[in-house]
């Protein structure tokens, strides 16, 4: 069965394989898609294997916060590289 998550994972994998370091902007886009790919995978694992609702909610919040922090780090990296 094809779901939205299945489709997004495949599209992200396609974009990652097509943007092998063409330039720095494409590298940042590739890393952004990688973050999305990892987040979707970890959300699926959390939903499948964590059965306590409070722990599941806490892990999903931590996952979202960590994805935001990682993307902020990539943005900082991009700004530093772009200015050199």
From Swiss-Prot:
Domain of life: Eukaryota
Membrane topology label: Multi-pass membrane protein
Mitochondrial intermembrane side: 25-31, 82-84
InterPro entries with a match to the protein in the record: SQR/QFR_C/D
Cofactor: heme
Residues annotated as transmembrane: 4-24, 32-52, 59-81
Protein name: Succinate dehydrogenase membrane anchor subunit
Provenance organism: Chondrus crispus
Taxonomic placement: Eukaryota, Rhodophyta, Florideophyceae, Rhodymeniophycidae, Gigartinales
